[in-house]
Amino acid sequence: MALHMILVMLSLLPLLEAQNPEHVNITIGEPITNETLSWLSDKWFFIGAAVLNPDYRQEIQKMQMVFFNITPNLINDTMELREYHTIDDHCVYNSTHLGIQRENGTLSKYVGGVKIFADLIVLRKHGAFMLAFDLKDEKKRGLSLNAKRPDITPELREVFQKAVKHVGMDESEIIFVDWKKDKCGQQEKKQLELEKETKKDPEEGQA
């Protein structure tokens, strides 16, 4: 899945020196706390991304709508990601796990035996977060935006557009998805019911 690829095909990044921090308003390398993880524990909508890697860009162009649920594990420093993709008017469900590096403010995933990383950029004021990856690579760098609401404000859209320009890409590279094309409502409902039943079974066995 394209979102899955974005989340896992990542590189460790240095701190970003903002030329206009008051305008870009992003912080890279901020430690991830329990409060941050509690805030992330929610339903999120993939809004869009600016990606120069041609393979990833092609995958994103196929997506009509994506939303996902994050469930952090504070003990193991991992998070479960349950994704719902609308592609070609069909819903595709996927589940994966990411590692959490609290001090570095990064998320990680093992791919082919190699641990790769992404910087988490929290935009708490806007109810959103960004993931930055491969910023050092002029041909593969990318930035994605995720929010708690699919219909983002003009202010958040502007923040993302400025951030994209700041890391060396053009606004024309941004691909936005259309939340109105969502076909995963029923699949999400079925998945939630299945999870409830799974939780019930152990309790019934102990009764």
UniProtKB/Swiss-Prot annotation:
It comes from the Eukaryota. Expressed by the liver and secreted in plasma. The modification Pyrrolidone carboxylic acid is found at Q19. One of its GO terms (cellular component) is extracellular space. Glycans are attached at N25, N34, N76, N94, N104. GO terms for biological process: acute-phase response; regulation of immune system process. Keywords: Acute phase, Disulfide bond, Glycoprotein, Pyrrolidone carboxylic acid, Secreted, Signal, Transport. InterPro entries: A1A_glycop (IPR001500), Calycin (IPR012674), Lipocln_cytosolic_FA-bd_dom (IPR000566). Pfam families: Lipocalin (PF00061). The keyword Secreted applies. Its main location: secreted. SUPFAM superfamilies: Lipocalins (SSF50814). Residues 1-18 form the signal peptide. Disulfide bonds join C91-C184. It is found in: Secreted. Contains a beta-barrel that binds various ligands in its interior. Eight genes coding for different forms of alpha-1-AGP are present in mus carolis. Functions as a transport protein in the blood stream. Binds various ligands in the interior of its beta-barrel domain. Appears to function in modulating the activity of the immune system during the acute-phase reaction. Belongs to the calycin superfamily. Lipocalin family. This is Alpha-1-acid glycoprotein 1. It comes from Mus caroli (Ryukyu mouse). The gene is Orm1.
